[in-house]
Amino acid sequence: MFFRGRQPEASIWRRFRVSPDGFTFTHDDGYYTAHVVANAERVVDLFHTLSDELPPAIDVVMDDLRSGRSWKGESVALPDVRESVARLKNLLARYGGVELSAYTSEDQLTLNPYIELFIYARTDRWLYLLEGKGLEEQARVRSKSWKTNRQHFPAAPDLVNAVTAAAERLGLQPA
């Protein structure tokens, strides 16, 4: 056995994944758009982490495709939203089927039901934040190929109950 020094550590996740986590970043009509694709856990975690870059009061919309219910709230405290997302992270990553948007007049973060992250903004600051999280800008990303309609999401009563409880905790109103 030869010892050549310290080998760089590579996690199994990094070694055997199909493609690097990536995003597209475009600029049209005064708005920047980022579309982020990675594994489900990473996308949900990015939504939670990047939401910390929003101002202290944000607007929130939640749409549960399984139950068909939607909620909306204006000027909701960011720490409360982040706490609710933290509680939902595992269920969202596991089941999907919930669209969650946190936005202001300047920025919008949207986690879609297929567990992809979209960012809409008036400035390009999100490009640098995404690169800082280790994501690679790509010409195009492979969208989730398993997109289905509402009837094809697997039953997830735990997620439906957790989303309903989160909407109540945040004081969101039915949309």
Which residues does each PLM region occupy?
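Structured alpha/beta or helical-core interaction and ligand-binding surfaces enriched in interleaved
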Residues: 1-116, 120-175
